[in-house]
Each structure stands twice: as structure tokens, then as C-alpha cells.
């Protein structure tokens, strides 16, 4: 079933929805971020990974500073319309630390 931005339940979590970013080819999870309506609209329009920074309270595009952009190939919405997956082709590391993925620390 196809969904539109109007179907997304932004209010469930205070205006934001979690976005899982996944490599479109390998299906590896690259990172988890959050989007508000405006950043999701930008992502859909530009096909680049846009998010809302909870710490800086502003929109940001992955790679705007590092150059490590992510081209969105597909946007998927979960069954409750309160979480999203961006399937992307990354141009470099996903993590701000320079690691390929953000999930590189094992919980012991």
C-alpha cells in the first residue's frame, strides 16, 4: 500500500519520526536519525537524506559538511506510519566519526 506524507504520524512522538538509513544494495543499517515533516518533504523532493537534529533543533542534510551524501533510492513507511526507512546509495562513511556505519560499538 502506498503512503503519502499526510499519512505519517508525526504527532505520536512530538513531531518527529525515526528514520532507519539502510544501504540500498547490501541492506546494511547505516544509521538512525529523525525527521520532521519538512525534512521528509525535502528528502522526497531532493532524493538526499534530510533529517531534523534534536540537539541543534534544525534541519540538516547528510553530507552537507563532510561531503558524504546519501542518494535516496526508495522511502519505505512502516505499518503504523510512524517510522521510515531510507534506502540509500552512500557516497562515503555514514558516521560522523568516519566509520562506515554508526552501529560499530558492541554492547558487552
From Swiss-Prot:
Which keywords, in A-to-Z order, does the entry hold?
A: Amino-acid biosynthesis, Cytoplasm, Histidine biosynthesis, Hydrolase, Magnesium, Metal-binding, Zinc
GO BP term, pick one? L-histidine biosynthetic process
Q: Binding residues for Mg(2+), per the UniProt record?
A: 78, 80, 82
- UniProt KW S-adenosyl-L-methionine keyword: no
GO MF terms listed in the record are: magnesium ion binding; phosphoribosyl-AMP cyclohydrolase activity; zinc ion binding
Catalysed conversion reaction: 1-(5-phospho-beta-D-ribosyl)-5'-AMP + H2O = 1-(5-phospho-beta-D-ribosyl)-5-[(5-phospho-beta-D-ribosylamino)methylideneamino]imidazole-4-carboxamide
Q: In which pathway does it act?
A: Amino-acid biosynthesis; L-histidine biosynthesis; L-histidine from 5-phospho-alpha-D-ribose 1-diphosphate: step 3/9
Cofactor(s) needed, names only, are: Mg(2+); Zn(2+)
Q: Which NCBIfam families match?
A: PRK00051.1 (NF000768)
Subunit structure, interactors included: Homodimer.
Entry similarity comment: Belongs to the PRA-CH family.
Name of the molecule in the record: Phosphoribosyl-AMP cyclohydrolase
Q: Which organism is it from?
A: Nitrosopumilus maritimus (strain SCM1)
Q: What taxonomic ancestry is recorded? A: Archaea, Nitrososphaerota, Nitrososphaeria, Nitrosopumilales, Nitrosopumilaceae
Amino acid at each position: 500500500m502506498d503512503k503519502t506524507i499526510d499519512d505519517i504520524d508525526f504527532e505520536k512522538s512530538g513531531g518527529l519520526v525515526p528514520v532507519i538509513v539502510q544501504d540500498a544494495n547490501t541492506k546494511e543499517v547505516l544509521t538512525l536519525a529523525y525527521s520532521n515533516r519538512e525534512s521528509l518533504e525535502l528528502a522526497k523532493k531532493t532524493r538526499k537524506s534530510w533529517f531534523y537534529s534534536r540537539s541543534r533543533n534544525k534541519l540538516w542534510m547528510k553530507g552537507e559538511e563532510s561531503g558524504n551524501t546519501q542518494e535516496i533510492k526508495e522511502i519505505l513507511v512502516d505499518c503504523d506510519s510512524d517510522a521510515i526507512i531510507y534506502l540509500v546509495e552512500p557516497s562515503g562513511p555514514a558516521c560522523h566519526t568516519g566509520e562506515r556505519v554508526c552501529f560499530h560499538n558492541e554492547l558487552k
